[in-house]
């Protein structure tokens, strides 16, 4: 036995140590005692290889040792060694094959002639790291270099190449079993066994070769390329030896790495049974020969316990595997799942450890197996022989729940037992992070002992009672609570030692004590030797039992072994429980296969023959025949008559019902919640676009296209098509023409079937071909069939397997930048695992529906799962959620009789019989009434009697849910046969709802539906369930899952009695009840007792409260009993359509009162009610809704659309909730009949919003991460639930998300950036919501293609004035002779001046003062804007990208940044009185526009063209655009506006903003203003542009003069243009046609190039100073275009002649009105300003940057929350203690003047005859005042002010031209003066120089300064009064 007997070991000493160890571990509760083996073998004084070993007796060995060996025979080393000891002492010794002392591990001798030197391979090549560290080693992809340690060369590491799949990941997990490696030395490849490989590289081992032991390190290359020893290979999950379970204490078989996988994830989580070696069995068959085969003991591999190995997991396991397996890979699957009789069936076992450790949690990767080995002899104590005919004799197939410890082998009739791992993971304590443990209220050290776990299990089983089945999730919570209690108790005691654990001796009687209260339902069997004894005993008793004897439901088998400690398992014998547990282990697909197998093989024949007779014992078929003969040819009247009235079939077919005009099928509304959710989706898309990840660029797209992928359901396809057609979305998105949209809709909906591949390829081709279209792939019901492609190809599963994965997760979809994926699901849990591909921030959840305030305004409320649960507390006599107890009793009786059939088969047969007999009972055989359950009887009664009550013939729908297609077809045939024989075939229809086929409805029923609908075409047939509204029918709904089909309002009953214990996941259960979810009348929820249960007595008491109609009266949380005061809704009870007479109709009815004949279940927000395209009204509202996204959606940077928009509020809720047969009725929720198992989970809602089903496993394709986890809180919102599932669930191996594992490099998961998830309860209206989303997404893209431009009429216009100089209309250019004779119009017409001071003209003096609108100083008003589509000639901001202007924008790479050069340019300015240094940043590509010095370093000038140049592909004038604060939003991309031709464009930016502008506009020339202008206004920029341009003109003239060109030939113009100019138009006046009408104006969009080239071609252009164009307005009239040219102010976009205006300067101090000021100055200098009226400019409303006001703050902030500072605080008395402000002095002054006219110029207010006289300046001093501008320059032209008395005088920074001749102006008495100067001394000098004190009176207190500190150079001004 290897060297395990080393040391002087007497067996007595061994026993003593063993007992001491056990005793110590039992006594101790805190400190880990030193286990037995470390005491015996690791004593330092003992030499490990002493030769004087003593043979122990085989018996002792058997008794004591065997059970201490773990699976590989390795010794159970303690877990308190240090890491290093563990590294070396982890020798996994094997028991040798004889009883002799150990011999070294014998290995095959090396082949002849091969090298055996240590450190070299058998081919003689060196493998040592020292010699290979500099070599370039070539290794195949997927391999890693690792270092192996040879025991003979401790100082060396040998280099090997190993396939990394066989190595563990960073957490010590996921290494494949086995080995695959290559020799680096000789290059030999393909070693498949580590043993073979270790021989080849000469490891010369003394022990069994193990990769875990000998492959020690990863090898890494350093930065110098040297190969060196890297990190240790992490074979164990955890190295911390204190708290967690010992990882190496259970060894997997020889080359299985002990990977710990996530609990019940991909592995089975149990170890295979322990087989001893032959030697240990005393069967030394090999006689100690030193061959390799004899020395390797027979390992049992790891057994797959699952009938579908590809899904093998800890949650499902059955006993279907036989024979110990060979070692295989995880990816290989077993051949035959059926057991071979008589072979051993290994059963997983969990080995106990020494008692000191917490429970073991080391599941091993399963290796399913193919070959069947010969069974090895096994000690009798470890086997159980399953008795023959166990199932037949006892009628029970026992289920053995694996507990804790080693399960024995089972022989014999193993098909009759099932081994279930249901609770096994509850007994393993998972490895949890400390922080997670703290959250759970646990400490790492305190876990439960086995004894406690046994007692808890028994307690749980006792508590379950006879009806319930153990639920894993329930038990996990019990275990968690118990641990939390222990932790609390331990903390309370502070010292763990005082906590007395249950001793093994006490365990049996404590266990029996607990079980004694169970009324014999739980038995405890205690054995001494092994569990096998107890199990055998139990099975034997079972097989010998007589049927009448009562069995316990559970037998708990405890093995109280002294050696192994306690082990236990539970044998479930209860008829109901064992069946439920066995069936719940199969997945839905598996049990459906099982059912079809039972039907095909005829196993059901006994059952079928049982149901051939009625409950009274008559032969059913004969009885029906008899009834048919008695009736003869006639049939029961189809409607409007009793069941006894008969007519001929011809008459029946010809009966036409009255038309029902109330149908609201076609009118489509979209409701407020749907709008809100659509907006949430849109805002999430904007958030993705804004998130810097560059995964979505919304500015790129101009169109939206979509495809909707739905599961394989024909009805769902048709339903979705109907929604698309009714919503009009195809026309709205511009995808189809109005006429053809109906037919074309089909290409937008695709089913997940085998044809999807081709259709999807067509779609993806469209995606690739249309890069400017944003495609949306909607994956509806995305939780269905979300299996991975890989698992689908390996297992023979459904054809649809993996299709969704193939489509949604294919590479093209992930990479397409113009494709958004929207997954829509009511049960999204399977998409919310740790491996989810959707970021949790991209989930959009339906808005919480149960908020009180919504209820007031909406007719319909959603009635979903939690409302159903809560309705049980309403206390009404006929609840909405029911369990048919009578039916359940019948089922149980039958199940006992047919133990071999699946319970669903039995239930289905019974259900068919129930409905058949109910039909017969109600028509012909009243004697059968007592044999139908009252539930079934009342449903059928309602179904067949309701059409008879009136002429419309409308009735109810009943859904019977039968998941198995074969059973459903059987049910349809049987029921149809019974119906037809009873003559009811015209009364109600029976429809098979098979997802794979279309609906088929008998022609006479189609005719009836058509006549109700009225206007349907001849060939119309019902295609969706909603089309069946009002048709009395039974729909037998089949298929694995319900797929989201919407049912009509006439659905009244939903029979889910077949949905049983096989549906134990949250999704499976909830989606079944989801069938019945719908919108109901408000009354139902507000006063359920009134609406649903009005017996006569309560009608009288129902108080009608007038004032309560707006609030939610019945809180859903509060139970309300029948007798509590019932509050009705406003209005009388008759409104609900309930009258006492109708209640009396059928007194014996047990279901809802019959007055609700057709509850409108799914009116209102049906799944996907969508916006009405019918009627202009709705269309209008929609447009409004989209427009109301508001201007802020124009850029993609605003991610939240405004929700307070006016649009949607006006959308109509339907006025009448339901259109029934008699007036308006309440829409009611359908009644749902459940099986007992489902009822207990859905009906038992204790508190909170969610029913108990929410704590189940969320979906069969996911697994819990750990059995220790917090409970899903019942009040969690869906967002919180999502986060919970993302933390606590994992995708299983066959799940499509399984492959999305952690990225090892970054430690994060890959979320797909363009994928969203929309979740909302079933039937809440998600389809309508996402169709609306598509619509508003398109609107928003259009908004991005639209621009808001100012649309304001000119101000101060007087169209009556006729130009004195007549201009001939239609002239392209002005004639300078006649133009210069026109007077200049000094009035400012630009609408942005509407709140500024008027400029005085003689005409203004004649205006009556009352006419002028008084506009008090107000907040900056909202200027009028209008939305215009951008055209191909627009100027763009940075959000525009297209292929054509990519070169122009040049974003290619960061390296481009360095391609531009910085040049200083200095010139002197007389105005500034100093040198100015500007910087040019010139990209390489633009250098041709400049002249550099010979050395090429120094910038000399900017090239200018000649006046005579005629180049059609260029504009001559350089374009300057000053811009500030708009690096992203400024319209600086002129590529399209210039039609791509050559032009020179310079951005003028402030120094501090330069880096930003440079980043966004790397290919633009920048002109950077000096730092001193960082706070300056736009006046400074314009001043410097003009100064620079004049200086440059002189330089160019000098340069070109040397080339012989005359100075006056150089082009003197520049364009100065704002950064918000977006579009240019040309206008022409259309000739009026013959009939007298308004002359029209036609306008056309033109490019900036066209405008500039036209203006530059003006004859004698050099004689004009400024040329401009007018501002666009939608109200441009032919009147304003009468004169093609005006001599007036021009703004925003001007051609400036720098030569003529050399001496007219912009005021560089100015922030406001600098252009009007400059125009007035230019005009007074006698220069010509010309405006071209046939061109107009559109200016974009840009919300950021530009002339936006500074926020004026105090210089020293005292507190954060200061009141806003008022304009009058912008000035103060000099040297006062006033709050000083942090703003430029000039800015404060201009802002002050705008608001101070009342203070400064009281006489001027509204007195336009007496304006304020302003010398050399135009300043805005408020709109109430007119300013008369007078220039002081000699020879200047000024307005005539003869006889004008001025009301004030404004002197602003006046220069030496202003002299004492001011005295010639006349002033009113009391006129006021304001003199503004740079500082106090110049203020005094000015007053003296101008002799102002002669006429004006000053007071000391009239001196002011702007509220700046002295460092900020305040401005000073003095006021005075005229005397």
Swiss-Prot record:
<dbReference type="GO" id="GO:0003231">
    <property type="term" value="P:cardiac ventricle development"/>
</dbReference>
<dbReference type="GO" id="GO:0001822">
    <property type="term" value="P:kidney development"/>
</dbReference>
<dbReference type="GO" id="GO:0002009">
    <property type="term" value="P:morphogenesis of an epithelium"/>
</dbReference>
<keyword id="KW-0225">Disease variant</keyword>
<dbReference type="InterPro" id="IPR048659">
    <property type="entry name" value="GREB1-like_2nd"/>
</dbReference>
<dbReference type="Pfam" id="PF20688">
    <property type="entry name" value="GREB1_2nd"/>
</dbReference>
<dbReference type="InterPro" id="IPR046926">
    <property type="entry name" value="GREB1_N"/>
</dbReference>
<dbReference type="InterPro" id="IPR046927">
    <property type="entry name" value="GREB1-like_C"/>
</dbReference>
<feature type="region of interest" description="Disordered">
    <location>
        <begin position="87"/>
        <end position="111"/>
    </location>
</feature>
<dbReference type="GO" id="GO:0035050">
    <property type="term" value="P:embryonic heart tube development"/>
</dbReference>
<dbReference type="Pfam" id="PF20691">
    <property type="entry name" value="TAGT"/>
</dbReference>
<feature type="compositionally biased region" description="Low complexity">
    <location>
        <begin position="1195"/>
        <end position="1206"/>
    </location>
</feature>
<dbReference type="GO" id="GO:0001656">
    <property type="term" value="P:metanephros development"/>
</dbReference>
<dbReference type="GO" id="GO:0042254">
    <property type="term" value="P:ribosome biogenesis"/>
</dbReference>
<feature type="compositionally biased region" description="Low complexity">
    <location>
        <begin position="252"/>
        <end position="262"/>
    </location>
</feature>
<dbReference type="GO" id="GO:0072177">
    <property type="term" value="P:mesonephric duct development"/>
</dbReference>
<dbReference type="GO" id="GO:0048384">
    <property type="term" value="P:retinoic acid receptor signaling pathway"/>
</dbReference>
<comment type="function">
    <text>Plays a major role in early metanephros and genital development.</text>
</comment>
<keyword id="KW-0209">Deafness</keyword>
<dbReference type="InterPro" id="IPR048657">
    <property type="entry name" value="GREB1-like_cpSF2"/>
</dbReference>
<keyword id="KW-1010">Non-syndromic deafness</keyword>
<feature type="region of interest" description="Disordered">
    <location>
        <begin position="1101"/>
        <end position="1222"/>
    </location>
</feature>
<dbReference type="Pfam" id="PF20267">
    <property type="entry name" value="GREB1_C"/>
</dbReference>
<feature type="compositionally biased region" description="Polar residues">
    <location>
        <begin position="263"/>
        <end position="278"/>
    </location>
</feature>
<dbReference type="GO" id="GO:0016020">
    <property type="term" value="C:membrane"/>
</dbReference>
<keyword id="KW-0812">Transmembrane</keyword>
<protein>
    <recommendedName>
        <fullName>GREB1-like protein</fullName>
    </recommendedName>
</protein>
<dbReference type="Pfam" id="PF15782">
    <property type="entry name" value="GREB1_N"/>
</dbReference>
<keyword id="KW-1133">Transmembrane helix</keyword>
<dbReference type="GO" id="GO:0055007">
    <property type="term" value="P:cardiac muscle cell differentiation"/>
</dbReference>
<dbReference type="GO" id="GO:0030539">
    <property type="term" value="P:male genitalia development"/>
</dbReference>
<dbReference type="GO" id="GO:0003151">
    <property type="term" value="P:outflow tract morphogenesis"/>
</dbReference>
<feature type="compositionally biased region" description="Polar residues">
    <location>
        <begin position="296"/>
        <end position="307"/>
    </location>
</feature>
<dbReference type="Pfam" id="PF20692">
    <property type="entry name" value="cpSF2-GREB1"/>
</dbReference>
<feature type="region of interest" description="Disordered">
    <location>
        <begin position="246"/>
        <end position="326"/>
    </location>
</feature>
<dbReference type="GO" id="GO:0001658">
    <property type="term" value="P:branching involved in ureteric bud morphogenesis"/>
</dbReference>
<feature type="compositionally biased region" description="Polar residues">
    <location>
        <begin position="1119"/>
        <end position="1161"/>
    </location>
</feature>
<comment type="similarity">
    <text>Belongs to the GREB1 family.</text>
</comment>
<dbReference type="GO" id="GO:0060065">
    <property type="term" value="P:uterus development"/>
</dbReference>
<dbReference type="GO" id="GO:0061205">
    <property type="term" value="P:paramesonephric duct development"/>
</dbReference>
<keyword id="KW-0217">Developmental protein</keyword>
<feature type="transmembrane region" description="Helical">
    <location>
        <begin position="1843"/>
        <end position="1862"/>
    </location>
</feature>
């Amino acid at each position: 036995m290897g060297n395990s007997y080393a040391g002087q070991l007497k067996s007595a000493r061994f026993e003593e140590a063993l007992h001491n160890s056990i005793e110590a571990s039992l006594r101790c509760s805190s400190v880990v005692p030193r286990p037995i083996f470390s005491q015996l073998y690791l004593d330092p004084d003992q030499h490990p290889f002493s030769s004087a070993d003593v043979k122990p007796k085989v018996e002792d060995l058997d008794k004591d040792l065997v059970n201490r060996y773990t699976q590989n025979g390795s010794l159970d080393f303690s877990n308190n060694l240090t890491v290093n000891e563990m590294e070396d002492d982890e020798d996994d010794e094997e028991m040798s094959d004889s009883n002799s002392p150990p011999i070294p591990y014998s290995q095959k001798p090396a082949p002849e002639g091969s090298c055996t030197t240590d450190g070299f391979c058998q081919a003689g090549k060196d493998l040592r790291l020292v010699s290979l560290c500099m070599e370039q080693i070539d290794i195949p992809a997927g391999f890693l270099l690792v270092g192996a340690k040879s025991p003979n060369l401790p100082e060396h590491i040998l280099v090997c190449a190993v396939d990394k799949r066989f190595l563990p990941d960073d957490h010590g997990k996921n290494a494949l079993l086995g080995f695959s490696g290559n020799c680096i030395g000789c290059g030999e490849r393909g070693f498949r066994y580590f043993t073979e490989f270790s021989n080849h590289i000469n490891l010369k081992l003394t022990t069994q070769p193990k990769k875990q032991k000998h492959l020690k390190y990863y090898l890494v290359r350093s930065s110098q390329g040297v190969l060196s020893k890297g990190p240790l290979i992490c074979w164990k999950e955890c190295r911390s030896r204190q708290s967690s379970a010992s990882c190496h204490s259970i060894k997997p078989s020889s080359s299985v790495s002990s990977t710990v996988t996530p609990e019940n994830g991909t592995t089975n989580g149990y170890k295979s049974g322990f087989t001893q070696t032959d030697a240990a069995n005393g069967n030394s068959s090999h006689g100690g020969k030193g061959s390799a085969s004899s020395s390797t003991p027979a390992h049992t591999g790891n057994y797959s316990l699952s009938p579908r190995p590809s899904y093998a997991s800890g949650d499902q396991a059955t006993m279907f595997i036989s024979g110990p397996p060979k070692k295989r890979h995880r990816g290989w699957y077993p051949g035959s799942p059926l057991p071979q009789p008589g072979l051993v069936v290994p059963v997983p076992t969990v080995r106990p450890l020494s008692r000191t450790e917490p429970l073991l949690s080391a599941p091993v990767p399963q290796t399913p197996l193919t070959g069947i080995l010969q069974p090895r002899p096994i000690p009798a104590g470890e086997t159980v022989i399953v008795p023959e005919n166990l199932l037949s004799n006892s009628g029970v197939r026992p289920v053995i729940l694996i507990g804790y410890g080693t399960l024995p082998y089972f022989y014999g009739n193993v098909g009759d037992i099932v081994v279930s791992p249901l609770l096994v993971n509850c007994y393993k304590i998972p490895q949890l992070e400390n922080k997670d443990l703290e959250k759970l209220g646990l400490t790492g050290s305190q876990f439960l002992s086995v004894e406690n776990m046994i007692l808890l299990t028994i307690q749980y089983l006792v508590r379950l009672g006879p009806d319930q089945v153990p639920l894993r999730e329930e038990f996990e919570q019990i275990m968690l609570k118990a641990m939390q209690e222990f932790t609390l108790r331990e903390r309370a005691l502070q010292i763990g030692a005082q906590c007395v654990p249950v001793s093994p001796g006490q365990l049996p009687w404590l266990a029996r004590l607990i079980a004694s209260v169970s009324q014999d339902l739980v038995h405890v069997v205690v054995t001494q030797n092994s569990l096998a004894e107890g199990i055998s005993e139990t099975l034997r008793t079972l097989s010998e039992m007589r049927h009448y004897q009562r069995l316990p439901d559970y037998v708990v088998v405890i093995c109280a072994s002294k050696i192994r400690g306690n082990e236990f398992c539970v044998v479930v014998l209860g008829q109901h429980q064992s069946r439920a547990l066995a069936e719940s282990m199969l997945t839905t697909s598996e049990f459906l296969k099982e059912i079809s197998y039972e039907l095909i093989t005829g196993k059901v024949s006994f059952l079928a023959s049982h149901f051939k007779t009625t409950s009274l014992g008559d032969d059913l078929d004969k009885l029906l025949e008899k009834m048919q003969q008695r009736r003869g040819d006639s049939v029961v009247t189809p409607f409007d008559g009793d069941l006894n009235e008969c007519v001929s079939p011809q008459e029946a077919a010809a009966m036409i019902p009255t038309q029902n005009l109330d149908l609201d099928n076609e009118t489509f509304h979209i409701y407020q919640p749907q709008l809100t959710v659509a907006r949430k989706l849109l805002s999430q898309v904007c958030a993705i676009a804004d998130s810097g990840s560059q995964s979505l660029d919304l500015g790129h797209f101009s169109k939206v296209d979509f495809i909707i992928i739905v599961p394989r359901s024909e009805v769902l396809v048709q339903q979705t098509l109907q929604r698309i057609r009714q919503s009009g979305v195809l026309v709205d998105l511009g995808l189809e023409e109005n006429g053809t949209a109906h037919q074309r809709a089909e290409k937008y909906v695709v089913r997940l079937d085998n044809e999807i591949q081709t259709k999807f390829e067509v779609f993806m081709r469209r995606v690739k071909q249309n890069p400017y279209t944003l495609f949306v792939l909607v994956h509806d019901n995305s939780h269905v069939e979300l299996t991975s492609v890989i698992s689908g190809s390996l297992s023979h599963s459904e054809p649809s397997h993996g299709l969704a994965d193939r489509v949604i997760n294919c590479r093209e979809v992930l990479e397409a930048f113009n494709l958004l994926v929207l997954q829509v699901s009511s049960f999204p849990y399977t998409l919310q695992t740790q491996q989810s591909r959707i970021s949790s921030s991209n989930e959009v959840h339906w808005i919480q529906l149960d908020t009180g305030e919504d209820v007031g305004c909406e007719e319909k409320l959603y009635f979903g799962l939690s409302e159903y649960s809560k309705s049980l507390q309403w206390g009404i006599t006929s609840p909405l959620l029911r369990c048919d107890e009578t039916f359940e009793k019948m089922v149980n009786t039958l199940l006992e009789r047919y133990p071999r059939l699946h319970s669903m088969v039995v239930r289905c047969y019974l259900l068919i019989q129930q409905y058949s007999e109910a039909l017969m009972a109600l028509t012909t055989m009243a004697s059968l009434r007592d044999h139908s359950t009252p539930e079934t009887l009342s449903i059928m009664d309602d179904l067949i009697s309701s059409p008879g009550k009136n002429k419309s013939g409308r009735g109810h729908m009943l859904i019977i849910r039968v998941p198995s297609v074969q059973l459903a077809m059987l049910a349809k045939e049987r029921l149809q046969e019974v119906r037809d024989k009873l003559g009811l075939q015209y009364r109600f229809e029976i429809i098979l709802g098979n997802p794979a086929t279309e609906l088929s409805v008998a022609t006479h029923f189609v005719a009836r539906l058509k006549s109700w609908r009225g206007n349907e075409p001849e060939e119309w047939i019902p295609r969706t369930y909603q089309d069946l509204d009002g048709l009395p029918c039974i729909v037998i709904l089949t298929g694995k899952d319900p797929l989201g089909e919407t049912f009509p309002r006439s659905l009244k009953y939903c029979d889910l009695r077949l949905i049983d214990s096989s549906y134990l996941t949250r999704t499976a259960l909830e989606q079944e009840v989801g069938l019945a979810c719908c919108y109901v009348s408000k009354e139902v929820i507000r006063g359920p007792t009134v609406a649903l249960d009005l017996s006569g007595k309560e009608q009288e008491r129902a108080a009608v409260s007038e004032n309560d109609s707006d609030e939610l009266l019945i809180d859903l949380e509060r139970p309300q009993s029948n007798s509590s005061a019932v509050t009705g809704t406003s209005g009388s009870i008759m409104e609900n359509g309930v009258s006492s007479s109708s209640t009396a109709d059928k007194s014996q009815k047990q279901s809802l009162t019959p007055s609700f004949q057709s509850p409108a279940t799914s009116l209102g927000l049906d799944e996907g009610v969508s916006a009405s395209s019918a009627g202009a009204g709705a269309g209008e509202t929609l447009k409004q809704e989209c427009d109301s996204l508001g201007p802020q959606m124009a850029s993609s940077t605003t991610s939240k659309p405004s929700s307070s928009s006016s649009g949607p509020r006006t959308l109509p809720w339907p006025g009448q909730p339901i259109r029934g047969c008699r007036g308006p009725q309440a829409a009611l929720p359908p009644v749902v009949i459940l099986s007992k198992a489902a009822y207990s989970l859905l009906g038992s809602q204790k508190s909170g919003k969610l029913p108990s089903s929410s704590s189940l496993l969320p979906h069969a394709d996911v697994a819990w991460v750990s059995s220790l986890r917090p409970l899903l809180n019942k009040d969690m919102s869906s967002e919180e639930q999502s986060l919970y599932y993302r933390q606590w669930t994992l995708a299983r191996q066959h799940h499509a998300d399984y492959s999305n594992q952690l990225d090892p490099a970054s430690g994060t998961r890959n979320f797909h950036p363009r994928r969203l998830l929309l979740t909302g309860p079933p039937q809440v209206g998600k389809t309508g919501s996402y169709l609306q989303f598509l619509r508003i997404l398109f609107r928003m893209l259009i908004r991005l293609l639209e621009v808001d431009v100012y649309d304001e009429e000119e101000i101060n216009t007087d169209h009556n004035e006729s130009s004195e100089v007549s201009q001939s209309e239609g002239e392209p250019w002005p004639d300078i002779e006649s133009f210069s004779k026109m007077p200049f119009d000094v009035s400012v017409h630009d609408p942005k001046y509407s709140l500024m001071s008027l400029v005085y003209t003689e005409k203004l003096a004649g205006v009556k003062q009352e006419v002028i609108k008084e506009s008090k100083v107000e907040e900056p008003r909202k200027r009028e804007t209008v939305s215009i589509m951008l055209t191909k000639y627009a100027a763009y901001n940075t959000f525009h990208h297209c292929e054509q202007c990519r070169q122009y924008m040049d974003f290619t790479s960061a390296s481009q940044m360095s391609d531009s050069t910085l040049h200083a340019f200095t010139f002197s300015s007389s105005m500034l009185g100093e040198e100015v240094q500007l910087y040019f940043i010139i990209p390489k590509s633009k250098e041709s526009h400049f002249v550099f010095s010979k050395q090429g370093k120094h910038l000399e000038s900017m090239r200018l063209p000649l006046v005579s140049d005629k180049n059609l592909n260029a504009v001559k004038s350089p374009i300057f655009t000053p811009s500030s604060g708009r690096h992203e939003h400024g319209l600086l991309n002129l590529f399209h506006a210039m039609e791509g031709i050559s032009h020179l464009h310079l951005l003028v930016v402030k120094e501090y903003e330069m880096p930003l502008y440079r980043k966004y506009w790397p290919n633009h020339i920048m002109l950077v203003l000096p730092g001193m202008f960082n706070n300056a206004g736009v006046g400074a920029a314009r001043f410097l542009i003009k100064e620079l341009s004049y200086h440059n003109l002189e330089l160019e003239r000098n340069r070109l003069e040397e080339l012989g060109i005359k100075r006056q030939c150089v082009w003197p113009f520049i364009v100065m243009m704002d950064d918000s100019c977006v579009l240019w138009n040309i206008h022409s006046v259309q000739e009026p046609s013959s009939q007298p009408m308004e002359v029209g104006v036609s306008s056309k969009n033109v490019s900036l190039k066209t405008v500039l080239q036209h203006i530059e071609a003006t004859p004698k252009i050099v004689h004009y100073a400024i040329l401009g164009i007018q501002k666009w307005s939608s109200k441009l009239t032919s009147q304003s275009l009468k004169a093609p040219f005006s001599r007036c102010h021009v703004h925003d976009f001007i051609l400036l002649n720098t030569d003529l205006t050399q001496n007219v300067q912009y005021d560089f101090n100015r922030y406001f009105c600098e252009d009007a000021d400059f125009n007035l100055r230019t005009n007074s200098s006698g220069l010509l300003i010309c405006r071209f009226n046939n061109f107009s400019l559109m200016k974009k409303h840009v919300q950021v940057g530009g002339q936006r006001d500074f926020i004026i703050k105090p210089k020293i902030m005292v507190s954060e929350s200061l009141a806003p500072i008022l304009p009058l605080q912008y000035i103060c008395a000099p040297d006062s203690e006033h709050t000083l402000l942090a703003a430029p002095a000039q800015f404060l002054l201009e802002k002050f003047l705008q608001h101070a006219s009342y203070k400064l110029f009281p006489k001027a207010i509204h007195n336009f005859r007496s304006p304020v006289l302003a010398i050399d300046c135009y300043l805005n001093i408020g709109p109430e005042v007119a300013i008369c501008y007078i220039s002081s320059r000699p020879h200047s032209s000024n307005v005539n002010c003869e006889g004008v008395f001025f009301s004030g005088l404004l002197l602003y920074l006046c220069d030496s031209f202003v002299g004492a001749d001011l005295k010639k102006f006349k002033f009113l008495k009391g006129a006021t003066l304001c003199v503004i100067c740079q500082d106090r001394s110049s203020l005094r000098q000015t007053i003296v120089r101008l002799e102002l004190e002669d006429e004006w009176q000053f007071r000391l207190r009239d001196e002011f300064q702007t509220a700046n500190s002295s460092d900020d150079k305040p401005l000073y001004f003095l006021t005075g009064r005229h005397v």
